[in-house]
């Protein structure tokens, strides 16, 4: 396996080196796309070139761009959106169902910007990349305090240099994360979505627009993984608050 190239911006970095870092951020955060001139963040690029922002803040600008929002937030299932946020911003796959549920709930309750900020402002991001290292796929090598299954899961999300992440809309780690197990890179042909082998999840919801002013109800929804996205959309339409999402063993 090829070694991982780590790119860092230094005070002495040349303009050519800064441009290399800009291209690397686009590739990492946007999931290896072709970025048209009209889609580039000209202002943020200029700010990075004159050092008025750090690489960390440039990453934030790219992750909050219309490019990222349209391809990953608006076009993908919530579970897939969270998977890719972990991959693009922290360089790893989610470790367990608690992590995924926490981020889905945050996205629903606090919004898109809060979800993106939660990765970039985390102590994990600070420890791994600091202010001026371009995020990279850390799951390709073993690290202290990382779960061994994460080493395998990264390959389910990162299929190599030819992959464009936005081309895959469905979640890749639902079963592996929910059961805290290693995953196969390709789903078994014997596993059929909607069959008895499909994992189910419990969504706990508090309140909705149908509740009386004096009574806030709590409702549990049991849904298969393939139906999670439309169920979350229905909950949002009733103004319900998602309290937790847990896998049913």
Swiss-Prot record:
Biological processes annotated in GO: photosynthesis
PROSITE patterns: CPCD_LIKE (PS51441), PBS_LINKER (PS51445)
Limits of the CpcD-like domain: 198-248
Membrane topology: Peripheral membrane protein
Superkingdom, natural source: Bacteria
Residue span(s) of domain PBS-linker: 2-166
Subunit structure: The phycobilisome is a hemidiscoidal structure that is composed of two distinct substructures: a core complex and six rods radiating from the core.
Function according to Swiss-Prot or TrEMBL: Rod linker protein, associated with phycoerythrin. Linker polypeptides determine the state of aggregation and the location of the disk-shaped phycobiliprotein units within the phycobilisome and modulate their spectroscopic properties in order to mediate a directed and optimal energy transfer.
Protein name: Phycobilisome 27.9 kDa linker polypeptide, phycoerythrin-associated, rod
């Amino acid at each position: 396996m090829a070694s991982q190239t780590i790119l860092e911006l230094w005070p002495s970095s040349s303009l050519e080196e800064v441009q290399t870092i800009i291209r690397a951020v686009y590739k990492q955060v946007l999931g290896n796309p072709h970025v048209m001139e009209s889609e580039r963040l000209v202002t943020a690029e200029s700010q990075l070139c004159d050092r008025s922002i750090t690489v960390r803040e440039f990453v934030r600008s790219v992750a909050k761009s219309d490019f990222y929002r349209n391809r990953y937030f608006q076009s993908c299932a919530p579970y897939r959106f969270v998977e890719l946020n972990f991959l693009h911003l922290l360089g790893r796959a989610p470790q367990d169902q608690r992590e995924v549920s926490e981020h889905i709930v945050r996205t629903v309750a606090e919004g898109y910007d809060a979800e993106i900020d939660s990765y970039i402002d985390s102590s994990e991001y600070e420890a791994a990349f600091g202010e001026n290292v371009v995020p990279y796929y850390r799951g390709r090598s073993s690290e202290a305090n990382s779960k061994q299954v994460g080493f395998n899961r990264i390959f389910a999300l990162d299929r190599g240099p030819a992959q464009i992440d936005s081309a895959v809309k469905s979640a890749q780690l639902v079963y592996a994360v929910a059961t805290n197990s290693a995953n196969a890179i390709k789903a078994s042909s014997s596993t059929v979505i909607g069959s008895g082998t499909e994992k189910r999840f419990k969504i706990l919801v508090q309140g909705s627009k149908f509740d009386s002013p004096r009574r806030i109800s709590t409702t549990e929804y049991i849904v298969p993984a393939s139906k999670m996205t439309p169920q979350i959309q229905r909950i949002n339409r009733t103004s319900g608050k998602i309290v937790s999402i847990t896998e049913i063993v």
